[in-house]
């Protein structure tokens, strides 16, 4: 780390932040601050600071009231009632007309919102009075309220061009979005300024923290950098078990990976505990499913696949590869940490007779290849999963791209039937059991090899108080964070 520090010192400016601003360092600029278009993780995290949603989520990923409460009148009709204190940043009340305009905009095919598909079950949305909204569904959906995480815009803004909005319904208002990607926000309750600063290089972000040019850096720091920062005076590291799910995806349309025994051999060849300990510095938890154990539909009896190289070799032999080494290509991003992970996987698979060829690609090419099915194996993560509809999106046979996210072309009639049954079940306890069955089926079939959930981390300067992190890595704590004097520190 010392060499990295010396090499990067010239990149750190001497500029000090304004005393009235709290500065958050992020690795990439948001693509949009418009809730109709905020589909990448950074855009979504910042957009929700500016645009409040009808529905929020508790720690078990259950829907709870946000801007509104609701009732289900029948299987395809939900009525939402807005809170009386909901206001835009100009002081106007948030009304049913604003909600209707926001949802109709996203549902309009001409807008080309990336969020439209997630709301495809809405047949109609109508204002009953100034605070009441009715949603009519195409099909019954007992989990429908959980799909309404879209930030609400003022009606005039919702009808306007992308990112041209003026009024915020969330805890912050927008001061400026600069050409370099930096964002200036003002907290509505007390006027505190928050500067969101793009610093692409992780080492430079760390150095800016030390220099006092940043106050908070959340996530996207290598484990060794976090360990080093934890030893620095004037800084502290906070952590929270995360829900970012990492996995290996397979192309099941042709080749040796169509054989479940080969996929199972790969799963048993991976020493998850060793990778979590040595590479992640214990800042991850081994996974058995997409959804963490804290999720309300997580199957309680799932077990992380065992590290068992003897069994892996036996499975490969049974699949016809006992006398020859199987060669497979693994696509990943060119990020240095992901390449180190790929090398560890390569070494572990080599021990059971699998030769893993690493194909590192820039992010755009890599993600494009995965979406187009141009891979044998790839490594990716799901960020912030809350809804069990991920099972349809990722594993139903009708969800192959471009209709969905079944990128590996997994096709099992039993899984399809379980997904459809779970979606149509209206009784919560029976629905939960159906999702448990889906998770067990996927752990057996292994269209994905589950790896781990990465821990959420943040590094704070000592004078920053009131900042906590949650499981999905949101920036929501900016609504309560504040700077304290030396006498107030604890």
Report each predicted region and the residues it spans.
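Surface-exposed binding/hinge segments that line
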Residues: 73, 81, 114-157
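Long beta-strand-rich cores associated with HINT superfamily self-processing modules
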Residues: 458-490
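Gly/Pro-rich hinge or "lid" segments in bacterial periplasmic/extracellular proteins
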Residues: 60, 139-195, 201-204, 309-310, ...
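Aromatic- and charge-enriched surface segment that lines or borders ligand/interaction sites
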Residues: 69-112, 128, 134, 205-208, ...
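Ligand-site clamp/hinge motif
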Residues: 181, 186-227, 346, 355-357
């Amino acid at each position: 780390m010392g060499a990295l520090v010396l090499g990067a010192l010239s990149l750190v400016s001497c500029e000090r932040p304004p005393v009235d601003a709290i500065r958050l360092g992020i690795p990439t600029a948001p693509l949009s601050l418009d809730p109709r278009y905020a589909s990448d993780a950074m855009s979504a995290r910042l957009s929700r600071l500016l645009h409040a949603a009808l529905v929020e989520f508790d720690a078990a990923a259950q829907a709870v009231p946000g801007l509104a409460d609701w009732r289900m009148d029948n299987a395809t009709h939900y009525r939402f009632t807005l809170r009386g204190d909901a206001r835009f940043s100009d002081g106007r009340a948030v009304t049913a007309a604003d909600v209707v305009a926001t949802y109709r905009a996203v549902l309009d095919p001409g807008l080309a919102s990336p969020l439209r598909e997630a709301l495809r079950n809405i047949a109609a949305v109508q204002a009953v009075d100034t605070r009441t909204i009715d949603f009519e569904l195409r099909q019954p959906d007992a989990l429908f309220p959980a799909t309404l995480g879209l930030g609400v815009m003022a009606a005039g803004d919702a009808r306007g061009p992308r990112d041209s909005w003026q009024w915020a319904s969330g805890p912050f208002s927008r001061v400026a979005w600069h050409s370099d990607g930096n964002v200036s926000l003002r907290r509505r309750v007390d006027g505190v300024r928050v500067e969101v600063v793009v610093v692409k290089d992780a080492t430079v972000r760390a150095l800016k923290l030390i220099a006092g040019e940043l106050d908070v850096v959340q996530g996207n720091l290598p484990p060794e950098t976090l360990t080093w920062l934890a030893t620095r005076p004037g800084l502290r590291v906070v952590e929270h078990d995360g829900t970012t799910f990492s996995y290996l995806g397979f192309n099941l349309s042709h080749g040796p990976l169509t054989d479940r025994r080969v996929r199972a051999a790969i799963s048993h060849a991976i020493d998850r505990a060793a990778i979590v300990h040595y590479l992640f510095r214990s800042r991850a938890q081994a996974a058995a499913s997409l959804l963490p154990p804290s999720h309300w539909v997580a199957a309680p009896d799932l077990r992380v696949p065992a590290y068992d190289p003897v069994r892996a070799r036996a499975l490969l032999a049974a699949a016809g590869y006992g006398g020859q080494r199987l060669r497979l290509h693994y696509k990943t991003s060119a990020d240095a940490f992901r390449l180190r992970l790929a090398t560890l996987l390569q070494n572990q698979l080599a021990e059971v007779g699998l030769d893993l060829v690493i194909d590192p690609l820039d992010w755009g090419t890599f993600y494009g290849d995965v979406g187009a099915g141009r891979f044998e194996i790839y490594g990716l993560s799901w960020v912030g999963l809350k809804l069990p509809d991920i099972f349809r999106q990722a594993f139903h046979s009708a969800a192959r791209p471009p209709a969905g996210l079944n990128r590996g072309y997994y096709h099992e009639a039993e899984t399809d039937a379980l997904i459809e049954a779970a979606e149509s079940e209206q009784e919560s306890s029976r629905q939960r059991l159906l999702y448990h069955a889906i998770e067990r089926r996927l752990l057996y079939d292994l269209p994905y090899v589950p790896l781990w959930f990465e821990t959420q981390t943040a590094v704070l300067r000592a004078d920053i108080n009131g900042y906590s992190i949650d499981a999905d890595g949101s920036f929501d704590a900016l609504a309560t964070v504040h700077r304290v004097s030396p006498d107030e520190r604890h």
